[in-house]
Amino acid sequence: ILMWDIYNEPGQFGTGDKAFKLLQYTWDWAYEIRPSQPLTACLDGAIGKEILNLNGENSDVITFHTYEAEKLEPTIERLKEFGRPLLCTEYMAREFGTTFEFSLPIFKKENVGCYNWGFVAGKSQTHFGWSTILELQEKKKKGEFINEGDELPEPDEWFHDVYRIDGSPFKESEIKFIKELLGS
């Protein structure tokens, strides 16, 4: 176990600071058992000033989510102020510019850890963008584009994942880039 992310995106979905009390309890419970691994709850990805402050004060490692390319470097600069290790736990969104080619050199330069949320296109369907599934389901309801029982077609631009279910890469150029960056 690398670390415990005790509460993903507190304050999201309109709960804002209403989630603050539950987050306080969550931090109390986590510190009561105090595992040997670091504790964290994301800062960028959480919503509400009190929530952000609480997570910043209590996280051993500062974790964050940044999907928009133009926000990545400013977010890293802002979070460096905590003086703790940084780990980006959600970032890969090709349609928003946070591709491997864009993001990984920044993480490397800034000494920020990261991991890719999706790997193989499968049951979770994270190769589809946030709006793709809803759009396709609407077309399906109208009898357009897709029939009951048909597989959803592969999107032109994937969101998270790297490999197809058969093991072939979505973009061979990404695999080559990652190998070159890692020196393998």
Placement of each model-derived feature along the sequence:
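Carbohydrate-associated surface elements
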Residues: Y7
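Substrate-binding clefts and catalytic carboxylate motifs of secreted carbohydrate-active enzymes
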Residues: L2, G11-S184
